[in-house]
Swiss-Prot record:
Localization in the cell: Host cytoplasm; Host nucleus
Keyword Electron transport: no
InterPro entries, per database record: Papilloma_E7
Organism classification: Viruses, Monodnaviria, Shotokuvirae, Cossaviricota, Papovaviricetes
UniProt-recorded name of the protein: Protein E7
Length: 98
């Protein structure tokens, strides 16, 4: 500050002195990475036991939906609510694990 009375110009001069001399407004561009955002997908499959049509809605990435597709083609099977209830209710509770 210069003198007894503080002016806006004095404060601005002090700020200029404390600011780093590095030019932060350079023309360098940073590459942005593409992020695979989750998307909604509708899946139609059939029940493993009774072949009733099942419809699922999931939200996942493109990679996630490909992984699910591979599981459904390989060795993952879905059950409808009725078949699931029948399978799990007819088992003893201690056998409901792996």
């Amino acid at each position: 500050m210069k003198g007894q009375n503080v002016t806006l110009q004095d404060i601005a001069i002090e700020l200029e002195d404390t600011i780093s001399p590095i030019n932060l407004h350079c023309e360098e561009e940073i590459e942005t990475e593409e992020v695979d955002t989750p998307n909604p997908f509708a899946i139609t499959a059939t029940c493993y036991a009774c072949e009733q049509v099942l419809r699922l809605a999931v939200v996942t990435s493109t990679e996630g939906i490909h992984q699910l597709q591979q599981l459904l083609f390989d060795n993952l099977f879905l059950l409808c609510a009725a078949c699931s209830k029948q399978v799990f209710c007819n088992r003893r509770p201690e056998r409901n694990g792996p």
